[in-house]
Amino acid sequence: MNQLELYIDTFVEYLQIEKNASPYTVKYYRNDLEIFADFLRSEGLSHIANVTYKDVRIFLTSLYEQELSRRSVSRKISTLRSFYRFLEREGYVEGNPFVQLHLPKTSKPVPGFLYQEELDKLFEVNDITTPLGQRDQALLEMLYGTGIRVSECQNLRLQDIDFAIGTIFVRGKGRKERYVPFGSFAEIALETYLQEGRTKLLEKSNSDTEFIFLNSRGGHLTNRGIRTILNKIVERASLTVHVHPHKLRHTFATHLLNEGADLRSVQELLGHESLSSTQIYTHVTKDHLREAYMKSHPRANGNKS
């Protein structure tokens, strides 16, 4: 293992232990760092401490030559800026050549969301007379009804649900914890699943578990398992739009804001540290926008002469 690989491994370990980064974040960081390592080797740069601002500019040019999007380039530069900041703090290098690098601002894409008719189709296709159908319905109700992330939903435990006041305890990103309310539809789906479906699924496993959502063998349902379940639900509903679990979170936020919820409350429900992360959801549906226009503009409904 050469020195750069050792630095990368040390940084990744820091992300996992100190920053509690998700496996997906770690994967993307490592990938970005390995791309930079390949560049250094191709340029004959043997020591990371010798990298200059000029080298960084050449690296940036090489990224654009690959026709990567601005967003992808910005993420890679952000990764390397953090990497060098870590190395500088640990005393491995004396400066951060990426500090001087300024990139054009990238606009955040508007998150996709589902219309009510599309949501209704998803909720109608699960066979709630079967254990798996009851689980799928409860899973769907939790993802849309609370807006929690897939990883947060996967890690829900029995003791995290308080049916008396209709809330769940959520362990969020970066060890941040919060309480999120759920409504009557989610309550009914959860109670049915816990009393019937989950009990039957658990019988297939030799061990007990406190996790709420189980796979077909009675074990803990994985993130990939949740995505597979949702794909099957979408297929049964014959939806033509792509639906990933995070789109249900986008839909949750969009529908709340469209119906008058304030931004700060939605921020708290989503577990966003920064309000700017929540502001990307302030788009509205075309129908909602037209309805507001027709109700509010003085010349929207005038008679034509």
Curated annotation (Swiss-Prot):
Core-binding (CB) domain boundaries: 2-88
Gene Ontology annotations for the cellular component aspect, listed alphabetically: cytoplasm
Domain of life per record: Bacteria
Domain Tyr recombinase: 109-294
One Pfam family from the record: Phage_integrase
SUPFAM superfamilies linked: DNA breaking-rejoining enzymes (SSF56349)
Localization: Cytoplasm
Catalytic residues, chain numbering: R149, K173, H246, R249, H272, Y281 (o-(3'-phospho-dna)-tyrosine intermediate)
GO molecular function terms noted in the UniProt entry: DNA binding; tyrosine-based site-specific recombinase activity
Main location: cytoplasm
Coiled coil: none
A biological process term (GO) from this entry: chromosome segregation
Keywords associated with the record: Cell cycle, Cell division, Chromosome partition, Cytoplasm, DNA integration, DNA recombination, DNA-binding
Quaternary structure annotation from Swiss-Prot or TrEMBL: Forms a cyclic heterotetrameric complex composed of two molecules of XerC and two molecules of XerD.
UniProt-listed PANTHER family: PHAGE INTEGRASE-RELATED, TYROSINE RECOMBINASE XERC
Functional summary from the UniProt entry: Site-specific tyrosine recombinase, which acts by catalyzing the cutting and rejoining of the recombining DNA molecules. The XerC-XerD complex is essential to convert dimers of the bacterial chromosome into monomers to permit their segregation at cell division. It also contributes to the segregational stability of plasmids.
Family: Belongs to the 'phage' integrase family. XerC subfamily.
HAMAP family recorded: Recomb_XerC_XerD
Protein name as it appears in the record: Tyrosine recombinase XerC
Species for this entry: Oceanobacillus iheyensis (strain DSM 14371 / CIP 107618 / JCM 11309 / KCTC 3954 / HTE831)
Gene name for this UniProt entry: xerC
